[in-house]
UniProtKB/Swiss-Prot annotation:
Residues given in the record as Mg(2+) binding sites: 228, 252, 256
Site (Important for catalysis): 146, 196
Domain of life: Bacteria
Enzyme Commission code: 1.1.1.85
Protein name (database record): 3-isopropylmalate dehydrogenase
Organism field: Blochmanniella floridana
Record PROSITE patterns: IDH_IMDH
A matching Pfam family: Iso_dh
Keywords: Amino-acid biosynthesis, Branched-chain amino acid biosynthesis, Cytoplasm, Leucine biosynthesis, Magnesium, Manganese, Metal-binding, NAD, Oxidoreductase
Length: 364
C-alpha cells in the first residue's frame, strides 16, 4: 500500500486525443486497484478545443492546475481546422510549445523498444532487426532553432524572405548531456551524440561540451555522429544504438525515424521532463484527425506514456514495468490495431485494445 496521493492533470486535446486518453484512464484505474495507489485525475482543456471554447489553446486555468499536479498526461492537439490562424494561437505552438517552456521541460525522452518476438512489426529486413531494438532517444527540447530569436518573415516580391535563429548555450548542452550519460550508466553504457559539427557553429559547441561532460563518466563510451550519417546507421544497424543524444531539430527528425523502425508511431511513447522530474507525457504521434472518432486509433503510445509517468515523475518503477509487460504481452498474443495489423491479421479497435491491456495488468 502506497500512502501517497498523486495528482495527475489530464489534457486529452483534439483529434484522437480524447479516445486514446480513455484507454489511459482504464490503465490508471486498474493500477489504482491492483497496487492500492491513491491517484486523483482531473481533466482540463487544451488545444483547438480550448481555443474554440475559451479563446486560448492553453487557458490560464489549465496552466494553474497543471502547476498543482505531480505530472501531466497529454493526448494530442491540432488539426486542419486551426491551420490558418495566427501561428502563435495554433494549438501546437500555443499549447504544446508553451507548456514545454513554462515548465522548463528541456528533456525529451523516447524509448524505442521491440523484443525479438515482435520484429515482424518493423519494416526493416529480419536480418537487420534480428536482435530486436532497445534504445532511447534523448532530445534537448527548449533550445535550438525552434526557440531562437530573431525569427520571422520580411520583404516583398523577389525580396521576400524568412529567417530562424539557431542558438545553444553551454548550460543547455551540459544539463541534457549529463542526463543522457547518467541514463546510459544504467543501460549498456553507450552514448551516441548527434550533430553537424562540420558545418554549424552550434554543433561545434555541442560536440565540444558533450565531450567535456563525457569525461565525468569514464565507464560510458561516447560516439559522435553527423546527423546525416546517423540517419543511415539507424537503418543499417539500429541494434548498435543505446542512448542517442540530440539537439532539438535533429532529435525531432531522428526520433520519428526511430518510430518507423519500431513499426508504427502509434506505439511510441514520449516523456518531457525538467530537472525536478516533473513531466508531460504524450504519444509521439499527432492528433490524426482523419481517423478521429472511428475507434481505430492505436492507444499503445498513450498507455506506454502512462507507464513513463509512473517511472519518472511518480518514481513507481514497478508499476511502469507491469504496464509495459502487459502491452508487450498483448502484442505477443497477436492483438493488433489497424495500423500494425499485417498479412491479413485480425485487428481490434481502440476500446478493445485498452480493455485487453488493462485485463493483462491485473493478471501479471
Amino acid at each position: 500500500m502506497n500512502n501517497n496521493t498523486y495528482h495527475i492533470a489530464i489534457l486529452p486535446g483534439d483529434g484522437i486525443g480524447p479516445e486514446i486518453m480513455q484507454q489511459a484512464y482504464k490503465i490508471l484505474n486498474t493500477v489504482k486497484n491492483k497496487f492500492k495507489i491513491n491517484i486523483i485525475t482531473t481533466e482540463y482543456k487544451v488545444g483547438g478545443n480550448a481555443l474554440d471554447l475559451e479563446g486560448s489553446p492553453l487557458p490560464k486555468d489549465t496552466i494553474k492546475n497543471c502547476e498543482k499536479s505531480n505530472a501531466i498526461l497529454f493526448g494530442a492537439v491540432g488539426g486542419p481546422k486551426w491551420n490558418n490562424i495566427n501561428e502563435t494561437s495554433r494549438p501546437e505552438f500555443g499549447a504544446l510549445l508553451t507548456l514545454r517552456k513554462h515548465f522548463n521541460l528541456f528533456i525529451n525522452l523516447r524509448p524505442i523498444y521491440l523484443p525479438i518476438e515482435l520484429i515482424n512489426l518493423s519494416p526493416l529486413k529480419p536480418e537487420i532487426i534480428s536482435q530486436g531494438l532497445d534504445m532511447i532517444c534523448i532530445r534537448e527540447l527548449i533550445g535550438g532553432i525552434y526557440f531562437g530569436k530573431p525569427q520571422g518573415k520580411s520583404g516583398i516580391r523577389s525580396q521576400e524572405h524568412a529567417f530562424d535563429t539557431a542558438i545553444y548555450h553551454r548550460f543547455e548542452i551540459e544539463r541534457i548531456a549529463h542526463f543522457a550519460f547518467k541514463l546510459a550508466q544504467k543501460r549498456r553504457k553507450h552514448v551516441t551524440s548527434i550533430d553537424k559539427a562540420n558545418v554549424l557553429h552550434t554543433s561545434m559547441l555541442w560536440r565540444k561540451v558533450v565531450s567535456e561532460v563525457a569525461s565525468n563518466y569514464p565507464n560510458v563510451h561516447l560516439q559522435h555522429l553527423y546527423v546525416d550519417n546517423a540517419s543511415m546507421q539507424l537503418i543499417r544497424n539500429p541494434s548498435a544504438f543505446d542512448v542517442i543524444l540530440c539537439p532539438n531539430l535533429f532529435g525531432d527528425i531522428l526520433s520519428d525515424e526511430c518510430a518507423e523502425i519500431n513499426g508504427s508511431i502509434g506505439i511510441l511513447p514520449s516523456a518531457s521532463l525538467n530537472e525536478h522530474n516533473f513531466g508531460l507525457y504524450e504519444p509521439a504521434g499527432g492528433s490524426a484527425p482523419d481517423i478521429a472518432g472511428k475507434n481505430i486509433a492505436n492507444p499503445i503510445a498513450q498507455i506506454l506514456s502512462t507507464a513513463l509517468l509512473f517511472r519518472y515523475s511518480l518514481k513507481l518503477n514497478h508499476v511502469a514495468i507491469t504496464i509495459e509487460k502487459a502491452v508487450y504481452k498483448a502484442l505477443t498474443l497477436g492483438y493488433r490495431t489497424q495500423d500494425i495489423a499485417y498479412n491479413k491479421q485480425k485487428s481490434v479497435n481502440t476500446d478493445d485494445m485498452g480493455d485487453i491491456i488493462a485485463s493483462l495488468i491485473y493478471k501479471l
